[in-house]
Amino acid sequence: MVNNSRTVIILKTDKNNDILSWNEKRKQNGLLPVPVYEEYGDVSEVIKRLKKICEVLIIDCPGHDSKEFRSALTVADILLTLVKPSSDFEAETLTHVTEKVRTAQQINPDLQPWVLFTRINTTKPRHRKAAIDLDKLLRENPVWIQPLRTRISDLDIFEAACNEGAGVHDVRRASSLSTAKAQIELLAQELGINP
């Protein structure tokens, strides 16, 4: 999106430094930097302010229940919760996440929550079956956060790009690059975001 002249801001609400490290690598590799803001605690007012000055605001919340996560849900437009379907531990977190989302939707009824299946190794039948089974389970009951149709494969290019501070659309040549780009483009399209 940054490469297409979209104004993008990242709000870092997680205390680890992954996003800052990623953005520093972007700069070192001559890629367009993405403004990163940091805020902790109740982040709802900062989100409202930042939404006014950019086209796309990405909020990086901790991967566990937190004040940051709960307050972000009250003002966010879209929630993506990433789950590796073959990991029982990750799939089991959906009960708790769904509860938090449904509570937040009482305040923010426009919130669109989605489950994104990630790191699916399509060469392993067990991984494919786990994705199919979890998809079916979630779709059987609308109380669950619903899964997106788009799925992200376990491709080395995603990690390699990230390690360079890039996204797959910043990369010129790599194995499985066209597949990775297509998956990201399908995700953006499904979410109604023009990359």
Map each language-model feature to its residues.
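Beta-strand-loop-alpha "switch" segments that mediate conformational coupling across diverse proteins
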Residues: 121, 132-169
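Inter-lobe coupling/hinge region of RecA-like P-loop helicase motors
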Residues: 159-181, 185
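Conserved C-terminal guanine-recognition region of P-loop GTPase G domains, centered on the G4
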Residues: 91-110
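C-terminal alpha-helix
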Residues: 183-195
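P-loop/Walker-type NTP enzyme "switch/lid" segment
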Residues: 1-63, 67, 162-163
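Inter-motif core of Ras-like GTPase G domains
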Residues: 66-87
